[in-house]
Amino acid sequence: MAVARTSNTRSTTRTDRSTGTTGSRSVTGRRNAQLHRTVQSINIQRFRAQGRTTFCNQAVHAIASKLGYRGFGGLVANQMVRKMQSPGSGFRQVSAQEAIRMAQSGKLVVAGWYNTTPRAGRPDGRAPGHVAVVTGEFSPGVPGIAQAGRNTFEWGSVRQGFGSKNVSYFVRG
């Protein structure tokens, strides 16, 4: 099976041995090429987990900074989500579909999950949440993200990054 790539899509070409015909099917959806280049420029693998410590917040801060927003410095994921929820933050909460559309147009879109479990010793008194940057549509109706964490990747589905958690989406501007 041959794999053809462009900056926005990945598809496979398969030859049916019984008929000799060739067909293509989409393996992943579409992502914004400029956002993808921004993600590549930060070398997201440098934010991969070290033991039980994860750095999703730092990866999102690095990407956001490259896109002109520097307001996440020093915040953990839960604090980032709370900040984006705050009036006057410059972010607004949107649906998954709107997040996809805004990311495909090149806007900074952050996916976030606020962990409500209490944990002493944390900056916000809660167990770690999670954040990632939406860069397009992974599959129909499913946001594609770049993330650091237990799994660190430049392109994957929101489900790969957050599992079944209740994710909120925030667009800048």
Where are these regions (language model features)?
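Compositionally biased, intrinsically disordered low-complexity regions enriched in proline and serine
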Residues: 70, 92, 115, 163, ...
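Intrinsically disordered, low-complexity segments enriched in small/polar residues
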Residues: 45, 67, 89, 112, ...
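Glycine-rich, aromatic-bearing surface loops/beta-hairpins
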Residues: 143, 147-173
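Short, compositionally biased, intrinsically disordered N-terminal export/targeting signals
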Residues: 1-7
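N-terminal capping segments
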Residues: 10, 14-78, 114-117, 126
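...with weaker cross-activation on analogous glycine-rich loops/strands in unrelated enzymes
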Residues: 73-153
